[in-house]
Each structure stands twice: as structure tokens, then as C-alpha cells.
Amino acid sequence: MKPLKGETLVSLLISLGLSALLLLLVAQFYAQTQQQNQHLVLQLKLQAELQRTIQLIGKDLRRVGFRAANPKLIEDNLALFELDEKGTAITIAQADNAPSNSCVLFFYDLNSNGCIGEKYTKNTCVNGVKNVAKNIEKELFGYKLNGKMIETKQTYKNVVNADCRSEDCQSALTQSTCNAGGGWTDLLDEKEFEISQLRFDWLKAGKGIEIKLAGHLAAYKHIQYETSLVVPLLNQEE
């Protein structure tokens, strides 16, 4: 009769040790993979939101100075809002104590009625040197950096008198409007996102603007993203 052979205690301990080490390595790999996946998901979330934001701003800026041809309109009010004889319809500035070029103000004919504003009577938007179009605030736009957040101009709040004359109408595009309290609202959720840079730079001959945008997640400041976009201004003269 042959004697039975089995594992020695040392061999058993070695096997158990190797198994435990393997399980530990698998657990560490799984945890690391989960962490990397979470980082990737959060990075993509930030990237998607900032890309959506810069595309939104760019889409608005492409329309700067647009005015539709309205054959029924006797006289429009664009000249009351334009900053010079070239028809300049945009200002780049900054709020007090904010980074340079972090505020942009502009207008365009959103509803394509030929005027800045929605309603007018007798087929004219002016009465002498005064504006008579209503709801002009709906076609006066703006974006700015305020602290760690992008703000957009509230188009339902009137910061310019509806019966404005040229100087008052043009105040919608002056630096003081970048400071106006109560006329701006957050564009993003401040609990989720923080913006570190919003900048608007003129391109050569004023025929375009480069937007620079950078930010991070509020809860994960190490997850960052930056992007830029060049926007042609097709409705502005040189």
C-alpha cells in the first residue's frame, strides 16, 4: 500500500499568500479603474458644458449688428443704438475690478422686424430723435465674467428707457452696463461649475472676436478644461 501524499503546511501557506496577493491586486486594479472612469465622466461633463456655453455665446456674437430689411418700415431706430457712423453694434470692456476684456455688450435684430425692439406704430421706430419701439431690452445682449461665474444680460429687464434718445440708447453698450446690478443672471450652475477665464479679444481689423473660456468643477477643482472659439462679425464694417 502506497503512502498518501499531501501538501505540507508551508506549501499551503504559500498558496494562500499568493491567492491573497492576487485578490489584493485585482481589488486595487478595480478601484483604480473605477476612479479613472469617474474622472473621465466628470471631465467629459465639464468639457460638454463649457463647449455648449462657448458655442451659445459664439452663436449670439455672429449676429452682432444684424438688421433685417423690412419694406413696410418707414424709419428704423438702429442709428440711435449704434456707437459710430460705421454702425458699430458691440463693445468689449469689463466690470470694475474684473479681468480685462471679460464683458461683451451688443445688439442685433432678433425678431427681424428691422428695428431694435418688438412693437412700434405707424411703421416707424422713431419719433424725431426718440425711440418709440417697445421691449428694446429683448434685443440688447451681453455676457460677462463675475467672480467665478459667467453671467448673461437679462433680456426681460429694461436697463434703458424705452423712449431713449441717442446718448441714452447707446448707454446699453457702455462699460457702466457691465456693472449694472440686477440686470444679469448666472449662465451656469454655480454649485457645479466655476469659471476661471472669460475673455473676448478683437481680431485684425475688428472683423472677428476670439472667445477664451476656462473653468473647473466646483467640487473637483483639479478637473479643468479650457477652450477657445473664433467668431466672424459679418455684419460689422471695417
Regions picked out by a protein language model, each given a short descriptive name:
Residues 163-238:
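Short linear sequence signals and composition-biased patches located at protein termini or domain-edge surfaces
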Residues 1-4, 143:
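Generic cytosolic/nucleocytoplasmic N-terminal low-complexity/intrinsically disordered segments
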Residues 41, 59-187:
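N-terminal pilin/flagellin-like segments and related low-complexity appendage regions
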